[in-house]
């Protein structure tokens, strides 16, 4: 029998502890090792047993979750999934948690609404199981993502066809500008920071989908903008894709790459979950295959699941140059692995070599 994933739940809310316990125990691969109402009780339990994953509340009496997380990561690193409310102030706190080493985040609004069979409950279980496989050596450098825990079940999984306009069949002229499309999930927030910090101010125009809920992407883009030479912002419908500028897909919206003549711009739309996500990497990549073809470069980074795999294959088939982050540098080698398995990847590189590859490719345009 396979070893179960043992979870320690730390939250000052009895109802959250009870709901999380109920939701997680519906999965036969998960068992609750213990629950604790604050970090001090959790510390005592950690002296007795070590879990595979910890779920950690952000706001608690006596010691907040971020302080406990930092102490834990400096003394005994364990995969941690943060639990937080969906607020703009909370988004800043959660970015600090990801910097401190949290693997992932789930929203309390989804926990409170979840029953054992709901889509939200499925997502919570998926996040915890994924965290148990995280490479902690990479988590400290490329720490996590933020997840809304809002996905469809496998039977309802939709493809990017629901968002893409019909293909025009028109020939695509080569332009002198290159556009870079990036997709990431678990581990992506810090992986993207490391990647973007290495790019100069005249880097190619770039569009990015990082799996995040609404209200978090604006804070994420603002944080990156303060760290990088390129200009980074949350995308707005109709924004042009310009050299030296990076557009981040807004949470809970899909982002498509569009083209008018030699000009690229983004279309930001509402719509159903695609590949179990909104925003979806597949939506961006498949739109890039149609609108940019060989003028594009596709990059798929650390993350669980298969979002982006089909889109990267279509980019590859349309003549784009495609790169996947390697397993050794990924926090979770899911999305890159699926893209490689589909045959849509031209080159596999460690994270610290991807920015250089972008600049080398740019010289060919």
UniProtKB/Swiss-Prot annotation:
<feature type="active site">
    <location>
        <position position="307"/>
    </location>
</feature>
<dbReference type="GO" id="GO:0050568">
    <property type="term" value="F:protein-glutamine glutaminase activity"/>
</dbReference>
<dbReference type="GO" id="GO:0006935">
    <property type="term" value="P:chemotaxis"/>
</dbReference>
<feature type="active site">
    <location>
        <position position="211"/>
    </location>
</feature>
<feature type="domain" description="Response regulatory">
    <location>
        <begin position="6"/>
        <end position="123"/>
    </location>
</feature>
<keyword id="KW-0597">Phosphoprotein</keyword>
<dbReference type="GO" id="GO:0008984">
    <property type="term" value="F:protein-glutamate methylesterase activity"/>
</dbReference>
<keyword id="KW-0145">Chemotaxis</keyword>
<dbReference type="InterPro" id="IPR008248">
    <property type="entry name" value="CheB-like"/>
</dbReference>
<dbReference type="GO" id="GO:0005737">
    <property type="term" value="C:cytoplasm"/>
</dbReference>
<dbReference type="Pfam" id="PF01339">
    <property type="entry name" value="CheB_methylest"/>
</dbReference>
<keyword id="KW-0963">Cytoplasm</keyword>
<dbReference type="InterPro" id="IPR000673">
    <property type="entry name" value="Sig_transdc_resp-reg_Me-estase"/>
</dbReference>
<comment type="similarity">
    <text>Belongs to the CheB family.</text>
</comment>
<feature type="modified residue" description="4-aspartylphosphate">
    <location>
        <position position="57"/>
    </location>
</feature>
<dbReference type="InterPro" id="IPR011006">
    <property type="entry name" value="CheY-like_superfamily"/>
</dbReference>
<dbReference type="GO" id="GO:0000156">
    <property type="term" value="F:phosphorelay response regulator activity"/>
</dbReference>
<protein>
    <recommendedName>
        <fullName>Protein-glutamate methylesterase/protein-glutamine glutaminase 2</fullName>
        <ecNumber>3.1.1.61</ecNumber>
        <ecNumber>3.5.1.44</ecNumber>
    </recommendedName>
</protein>
<dbReference type="InterPro" id="IPR001789">
    <property type="entry name" value="Sig_transdc_resp-reg_receiver"/>
</dbReference>
<comment type="function">
    <text>Involved in chemotaxis. Part of a chemotaxis signal transduction system that modulates chemotaxis in response to various stimuli. Catalyzes the demethylation of specific methylglutamate residues introduced into the chemoreceptors (methyl-accepting chemotaxis proteins or MCP) by CheR. Also mediates the irreversible deamidation of specific glutamine residues to glutamic acid.</text>
</comment>
<dbReference type="InterPro" id="IPR035909">
    <property type="entry name" value="CheB_C"/>
</dbReference>
<dbReference type="Pfam" id="PF00072">
    <property type="entry name" value="Response_reg"/>
</dbReference>
<keyword id="KW-0378">Hydrolase</keyword>
<feature type="active site">
    <location>
        <position position="185"/>
    </location>
</feature>
<feature type="domain" description="CheB-type methylesterase">
    <location>
        <begin position="173"/>
        <end position="359"/>
    </location>
</feature>
């Amino acid at each position: 029998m396979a070893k179960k994933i043992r979870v320690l739940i730390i939250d000052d809310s009895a109802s959250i502890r009870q709901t999380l316990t109920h939701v997680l125990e519906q999965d036969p691969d998960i068992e609750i090792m213990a629950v604790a109402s604050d970090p001090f009780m959790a510390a005592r339990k950690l002296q007795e047993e070590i879990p595979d994953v910890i779920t950690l509340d952000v706001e608690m009496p006596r010691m907040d979750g971020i302080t406990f997380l930092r102490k834990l990561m400096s003394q005994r690193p364990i995969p941690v999934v943060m639990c937080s409310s969906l607020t703009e102030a909370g988004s800043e706190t959660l970015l600090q948690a990801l910097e401190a080493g949290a693997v992932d985040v789930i929203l309390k609004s989804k926990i409170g609404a979840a029953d054992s069979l709901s889509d939200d409950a499925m997502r919570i279980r998926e996040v915890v199981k994924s965290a148990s496989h995280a490479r902690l050596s990479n988590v400290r450098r490329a720490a996590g993502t933020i997840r809304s825990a809002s996905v469809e079940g496998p039977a309802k999984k939709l493809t990017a066809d629901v968002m893409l306009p019909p293909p025009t069949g028109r020939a695509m002229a080569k332009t002198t500008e290159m556009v870079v499309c990036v997709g990431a999930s678990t581990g992506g927030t810090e992986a993207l920071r490391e990647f973007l910090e290495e790019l100069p101010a005249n880097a190619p125009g770039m569009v990015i989908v990082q799996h995040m809920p609404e209200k978090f992407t604006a804070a994420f883009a603002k944080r990156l903008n303060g760290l990088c030479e390129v200009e980074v912002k949350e995308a707005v419908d109709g924004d042009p894709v310009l050299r030296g500028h990076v557009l981040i897909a807004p949470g809970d919206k899909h982002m498509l790459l569009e083209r008018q003549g030699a000009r690229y711009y983004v279309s930001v739309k509402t719509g159903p979950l695609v590949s179990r996500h909104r925003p979806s990497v597949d939506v961006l990549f498949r739109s890039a295959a149609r609108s940019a073809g060989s003028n594009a470069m596709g990059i798929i980074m650390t993350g669980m699941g298969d979002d982006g795999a089909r889109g990267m294959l279509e980019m590859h088939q349309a003549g784009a140059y495609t790169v996947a982050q390697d397993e050794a540098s990924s926090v979770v080698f899911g999305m890159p692995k699926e893209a490689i398995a589909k045959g849509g990847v031209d080159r596999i590189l460690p994270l610290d070599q991807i920015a250089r590859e972008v600049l080398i490719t740019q010289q060919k345009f």
